[in-house]
């Protein structure tokens, strides 16, 4: 299926690895122009080499998204160069495991800023151009906003807000034909997830923990791949989903909405 993304300029935050990288690479395969925002974290050269094998038309900006004021100049530069902005994928963020009883309000607010504010600012700055192009926004969220997890108070608050903003922005921009949707991720195999699994001990202990998790995923009892999330994201960015807005799309093998006791 042709997603009609050829030449579309799409921002992707946190795009050097994990889910963001998968989305950026898939956009490149579809002929889009990925504009990747990410801090320097040691993998930028590897990412550049990998995406360069797919396309020569992409942009990379080194930015700490906690520095919210740095977003607007990048948006203006991209618009000036290409003359249009067609999509935004808000992806960057991390689960910092800040729990209720041991987290100060200052650290809570800092976490919200790091996981939420840049979602707002990037859409705020690109909004006039998305109206021009009748573009699409995809916010990457997490199942912790829907299910709770424990020990994720700040992260759950940010991801819950992202789901709320998805529907608010969909309503606010519906008359401009700008579509806004969210991808709700549950258990996805990423470098961050792999590092987390390693904290459970030796290889046998890691495998035991991983099996406990995958056994609860109804569809095929396996983790969701980055590529599966990227494919759904690209579909939502494309005109092939032209009458889809305000939706929370769970890409999770049925983890949230199906009975986890299913054999």
What are these regions (language model features)?
Residues 142:
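Residue(s) in the substrate-gating loop at a strand-loop-helix junction
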Residues 128, 171-175, 242:
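Alpha-helical segment proximal to the catalytic Tyr-Lys
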Residues 182, 204-240, 244, 251-253:
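C-terminal helical subdomain
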Residues 99-100, 104-112, 213:
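Substrate-binding pocket helix/loop in short-chain dehydrogenase/reductase
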Residues 147, 234, 245-263:
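Short C-terminal tail/terminal secondary-structure segment
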Residues 16-18:
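Conserved glycine-rich cofactor-binding loop
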Residues 123, 158, 166:
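Active-site helix of classical SDR
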């Amino acid at each position: 299926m042709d997603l009609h993304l050829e030449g579309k300029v799409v921002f992707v935050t946190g795009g050097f690895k994990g889910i963001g990288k998968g989305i950026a690479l898939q956009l490149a395969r579809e002929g889009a122009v990925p504009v990747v925002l990410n801090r320097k974290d040691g993998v930028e050269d590897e990412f550049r080499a990998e995406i360069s094998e797919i396309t020569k038309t992409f942009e990379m900006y080194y930015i700490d998204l906690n520095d919210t004021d740095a977003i607007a100049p990048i948006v203006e530069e991209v618009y000036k160069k290409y003359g249009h902005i067609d999509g935004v994928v808000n992806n960057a963020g991390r689960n910092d495991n800040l729990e209720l009883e041991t987290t100060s309000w200052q650290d809570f607010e800092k976490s919200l800023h790091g996981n939420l504010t840049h979602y707002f600012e990037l859409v705020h700055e690109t909004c006039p151009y998305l109206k021009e192009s009748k573009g699409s926004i995809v916010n990457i969220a997490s199942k912790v906003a829907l299910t709770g997890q424990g020990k994720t108070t700040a992260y759950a608050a940010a991801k819950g807000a992202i789901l709320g903003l998805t529907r608010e922005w969909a309503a606010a921009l519906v008359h401009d034909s700008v579509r806004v949707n969210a991808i709700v991720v549950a258990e996805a195999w990423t470098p961050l997830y792999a590092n987390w699994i390693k904290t459970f001990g030796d290889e046998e202990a890691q495998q035991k923990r991983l099996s406990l998790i995958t056994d609860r995923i109804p569809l095929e009892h396996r983790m969701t791949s980055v590529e599966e999330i990227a494919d759904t994201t690209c579909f939502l960015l494309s005109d092939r989903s032209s009458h889809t807005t305000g939706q929370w799309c769970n890409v999770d093998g049925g983890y949230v909405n199906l009975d986890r006791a299913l054999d």
